[in-house]
Amino acid sequence: MKNNYTSLKSSIDEEGELKTDHEIDLEKGPLPEYDSEEESTLPPYSDHARLSNSPNTHRENNPSRSTDNSSPFLIKLLISFTPIYVLNVLAICYLKYNDAFFKNYGAAEWTLFGFWCLVCTLALIFLTYFYETWTKAVGKGIKHFLKKWENMPMAFSEVFLFNILVGSPRMNLRYIFGDRWGLKWSLAEHITFVVLSILVFIAETVKPGSIRVNLIRKMGYEAKQQVNEYTAVPLREMNPESEA
């Protein structure tokens, strides 16, 4: 009996099988030689090779988003608390020196203490919230300040002269306002005087003579304005013919 077996493959499929051994895919390029003896190598363009060479996932491309942000916040909080801590240490040392640290405190003293704690808390919140802004500003200011180091001796001498001229009125505050009120006024004016001295030192270091020059210019401008007001002549007096 004859076998009437008929192939189900069409002529197009047979032509495709013949072409696969000789034709080159233009997108993938020529196929490299594949060594079947090496178990680690895989035939190119296989599904397993595609999976092994898959691109990085979103988490691998963005590892920073999956990290914890608690540590930077604690660092910001610690750095923001540092200037407040230094200021409080200076105030405590001054009170200890005058033997007035939590001694004989009345209602007024405790009110001032509570107000001071509130100011420190608000300052800590403000410095933590605007951490990037004030740290960048301080960094730029320090760099600009250090570039003017040659002006520091002159600025220091001016601050020293400023302390001598204003020192005697400061010492008389205790005697003018009495022992009890003199302590409060002495502490307030001491802090104010220290801040003013620091500002004068910074201003004279960054721009030498800025305070003196601006003060002299302002006084000269005001004097010139006063002279012009008193010596100004109306237009009618200068041109009497215009009235006729």
UniProtKB/Swiss-Prot annotation:
<feature type="compositionally biased region" description="Basic and acidic residues">
    <location>
        <begin position="17"/>
        <end position="30"/>
    </location>
</feature>
<dbReference type="GO" id="GO:0110134">
    <property type="term" value="P:meiotic drive"/>
</dbReference>
<dbReference type="Pfam" id="PF03303">
    <property type="entry name" value="WTF"/>
</dbReference>
<keyword id="KW-0812">Transmembrane</keyword>
<dbReference type="GO" id="GO:0005774">
    <property type="term" value="C:vacuolar membrane"/>
</dbReference>
<comment type="function">
    <text>Acts as a suppressor component of the dual wtf meiotic drive system, and can suppress but not confer meiotic drive by compatible poisons. Wtf meiotic drive systems promote unequal transmission of alleles from the parental zygote to progeny spores by encoding a poison and an antidote from the same locus; the poison is trans-acting and forms toxic aggregates in all spores within an ascus, wherease the antidote is spore-specific and targets aggregates for degradation by the vacuole.</text>
</comment>
<keyword id="KW-0926">Vacuole</keyword>
<comment type="similarity">
    <text>Belongs to the WTF family.</text>
</comment>
<feature type="region of interest" description="Disordered">
    <location>
        <begin position="1"/>
        <end position="68"/>
    </location>
</feature>
<feature type="transmembrane region" description="Helical">
    <location>
        <begin position="183"/>
        <end position="203"/>
    </location>
</feature>
<keyword id="KW-1133">Transmembrane helix</keyword>
<feature type="transmembrane region" description="Helical">
    <location>
        <begin position="73"/>
        <end position="93"/>
    </location>
</feature>
<feature type="compositionally biased region" description="Polar residues">
    <location>
        <begin position="1"/>
        <end position="10"/>
    </location>
</feature>
<feature type="transmembrane region" description="Helical">
    <location>
        <begin position="149"/>
        <end position="169"/>
    </location>
</feature>
<protein>
    <recommendedName>
        <fullName>Meiotic drive suppressor wtf2</fullName>
    </recommendedName>
</protein>
<keyword id="KW-0472">Membrane</keyword>
<feature type="transmembrane region" description="Helical">
    <location>
        <begin position="110"/>
        <end position="130"/>
    </location>
</feature>
<dbReference type="InterPro" id="IPR004982">
    <property type="entry name" value="WTF"/>
</dbReference>
<comment type="subunit">
    <text>Homomer. Interacts with other proteins that exhibit high sequence similarity.</text>
</comment>
